[in-house]
Amino acid sequence: MIELPWPPSSLSGHAKGNWHGKAGVTAKHRVWAKAATLAARSMIVVPETGDIRVHVMFYPPSRRGDRVNYPNLMKPYWDGIADALHVNDSRFLPSYGFGEPVKDGKVVVTVG
């Protein structure tokens, strides 16, 4: 299980603004995802070929968000997890769940 901080709205594909301002935030979240995955690596079994099932539970910081858009915030996390597992993120077969809001929000990823 990989626990990550709630991603900011600036990571959304719909976010406005210059790409340069978004690049630092994207890189930071990718590094967090890689570090968290490496910490949990001993509990993760990755098949040699084929799809890798990944379940994501979103625990938003409040009820204000739009659950349809939460998966759009995940790209830097997918990249960081893929880096740590040495796989292409196109192999991920994601499923999503939505929990009750928690303070500051979090994303919990289960691989396998």
Regions found by a protein language model. Give the residues of each.
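Catalytic phosphate/metal-binding cores of nucleic-acid and nucleotide-processing enzymes, i.e., regions
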Residues: 1-112
